[in-house]
Amino acid sequence: MLIQTDYVGWLNETITLLKQKNFDQVDWENLIEEIESLGRSQKRELRNRLTTMLEHCLKLCYTDYVEDYRGWQETIRRSQRELEELLRDSPSLKPYWDQVFLDCYATALKSLRDNPDYQSFNLPDDCPFPQEISQILQKKVWR
């Protein structure tokens, strides 16, 4: 199968077949699989970016590594912009945000607690940051 030897070639061929409405020649099984994986990829990207942002918010608010604050602030702002863009491009991810927000916080918290550099800090079990998308992406949540 072309998809196994030349992915871009397979994509181009599939696009051509669809545009020509030559549906009986389309590799439907692989096309469906690829479309499903796109959705999973978008969800994974949201989880990863949100977890990174929450981890850096925790570092900024609950540690005293002042020399790292600026870098963490930059990472938070970049994560906010990237999450805004992702949600603007895929608004149907907004309900997913609510489903994974606390899990992302738990992942960020575990990551820090497992790191010896942060074990001496009192990190909160409950998320101190707003879960509402418009609040956490539009303001300096570390204040």
Give residue ranges: language-model regions.
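Surface/interface-facing alpha-helical segments and adjacent flexible terminal/loop regions used
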Residues: 1-51, 58-143
